[in-house]
């Protein structure tokens, strides 16, 4: 039987205890992180109540399985299936979605490397550069970058997109970008998987559009609210709207039936008044008293007013069109005069 080094046993024990001490356990890839950015990330994670521990993949796997057995949570073992590249264990009290967002927000720019895939479009901005004239001008021009020498410096004539998101950096372009000080890459902790409450979350699940989900929740809330009000399902949120709707419906029925209360009397009288005017319009003038005639006249003026405003507006537009046509004719005549002297 092969001898297992004591430091390995101790490492597995410490990792397992770490896993058992936090509700959220993440596997992260640290292989792309240089030493200094990695130390900064460790500090940020500690400041936010978590810990990052980097170890060998085999020891991390053993620690996860050991913790799963001791906690009686066999589903935790599934996390070990996502160990890849240079894995590290990140334990925290943040929920998986907040953790993913936190790690994405704390990614840092990095210099160009040949063969690396850029995460977003790379643009060389217009303007002077710190570069002195030399072979690099020809290299830029050969790659479609509009560069020329102005006042002893290499100047870019216009903003130029040299790479689209997902494209690979060539050695020639890497040299140019590094010379210009443009850092098209990002370094950070890449999430491999996160465990919480028996569920393992992968990056494609965690990478959500927050605003889209907020909009969806708001729409769902409004639909549920409207449904609850329409079926008169009382809750603390809907009871006021349900009572208001019931009151308005009862009032409408009472007005329709002519049932007089202090809430309906004004609407009933108004309805009767409008019915009276409609009836009066059908009668000869000699049968109407002066007060009724005044009311009918006032109603007619109110009805005609919007029509007059519309007609005035139409006349103004027609007048404006005529003036524009006359101006066009004058310009045409002036042009002919200039042409033929």
Swiss-Prot record:
Example GO biological process: cytoplasmic translation
Keywords (A to Z) from UniProt: Ribonucleoprotein, Ribosomal protein, RNA-binding, rRNA-binding
Annotated Pfam families: Ribosomal_L10, RL10P_insert
Family annotation (CDD domains): Ribosomal_P0_L10e
The UniProt record lists the keyword Protein transport: no
One GO CC annotation: cytosolic large ribosomal subunit
InterPro entries linked: Ribosomal_protein_uL10, Ribosomal_uL10, Ribosomal_uL10-like_insert, Ribosomal_uL10-like_insert_sf, Ribosomal_uL10-like_sf, Ribosomal_uL10_arc
MF annotations from Gene Ontology: large ribosomal subunit rRNA binding; structural constituent of ribosome
Oligomeric and partner information: Part of the 50S ribosomal subunit. Forms part of the ribosomal stalk which helps the ribosome interact with GTP-bound translation factors. Forms a heptameric L10(L12)2(L12)2(L12)2 complex, where L10 forms an elongated spine to which the L12 dimers bind in a sequential fashion.
NCBIfam families with a match to the protein in the record: PRK04019.1-2, PRK04019.1-5
Function: Forms part of the ribosomal stalk, playing a central role in the interaction of the ribosome with GTP-bound translation factors.
The family this protein is said to belong to: Belongs to the universal ribosomal protein uL10 family.
Official protein name in the record: Large ribosomal subunit protein uL10
Native source organism of the sequence: Pyrococcus abyssi (strain GE5 / Orsay)
Gene this chain is encoded by: rpl10
